[in-house]
From Swiss-Prot:
GO terms for molecular function: uracil DNA N-glycosylase activity. Excises uracil residues from the DNA which can arise as a result of misincorporation of dUMP residues by DNA polymerase or due to deamination of cytosine. The active site is at 62 (proton acceptor). Belongs to the uracil-DNA glycosylase (UDG) superfamily. UNG family. This is Uracil-DNA glycosylase. Keywords: Cytoplasm, DNA damage, DNA repair, Hydrolase.
Length: 217
């Protein structure tokens, strides 16, 4: 499922047998219709970014619900897939903030310690938020609580009202929060553009004596 250290820490914030409930939910969901991402990628964010290496969280809401888009990392799509509108705006802000990045696949961010987590880890094809409120929120809230317990600083990047509500779980004064409106076309001009989250994150990390993220990689 998830990286083993993640697994043990997350369990401490969940009711007993919650992992069993998740597996039952996944069995039923994938048996009853088309669900994104592919099942082997549901926990990809936790598999490719170990807890001990996580220094940034970018929280999304749920996976892309179009064909071949979702890959288990928030806002990221496979390289051969056209960038969805929110990712287009993220890359536009990145270009204005630091420089141009042509890649749509954000896996290189994940490998540098950026946890690309969605609050819901699955979605029915064509139904945005179709699995919201069913199983995932206690699990992904637990991920945030685990990060909150880290001794080393974490930068939490929270875009949009939904993500910003998760500030309630970030109580450790060692951590930092960068928040703005969501990069979606509906809200990007209300304060996402010009918010410079990438350079601000690196400034925080470097001030804390940590290596910044190569956002253009």
């Amino acid at each position: 499922m998830a990286h083993s250290i993640w697994h043990e820490k997350i369990k401490s914030f969940l009711p007993e047998h919650y992992y069993g409930r998740i597996n039952h939910f996944l069995d039923e969901a994938y048996a009853s219709g088309l669900v994104y991402p592919q099942r082997e990628n549901v926990f990809k964010a936790l598999q490719v970014t170990p807890l001990e290496e996580t220094k940034v969280l970018i929280l999304g809401q749920d996976p892309y619900h179009g064909p071949k888009q979702a890959q288990g990392l928030s806002f990221s799509v496979p390289e051969e897939i056209s960038a969805p509108p929110s990712l287009i705006n993220i890359l536009k802000e990145l270009a204005d903030d630091i420089g141009p990045r042509d890649h749509h696949d954000l896996s290189t961010w994940a490998s540098q310690g950026v946890l690309l987590l969605n609050a819901c880890l699955t979605v029915p094809a064509g139904q945005a938020n179709g699995h919201a409120g069913l199983i995932w929120e206690p699990f992904t809230d637990a991920v945030i609580k685990v990060l909150n317990e880290k001794d080393s600083p974490v930068v939490f990047i929270l875009w949009g009202a939904y993500a910003r509500k998760k500030k309630a779980f970030i109580t450790n004064p060692k951590h930092h929060i960068i928040e703005s409106p969501h990069p979606s076309p509906l809200s990007s001009y209300r304060g996402f553009f010009g918010s410079k989250p990438f350079s601000r994150t690196n400034a925080i990390l470097e001030k804390e004596g940590m290596i910044g993220i190569d956002w253009l990689q």
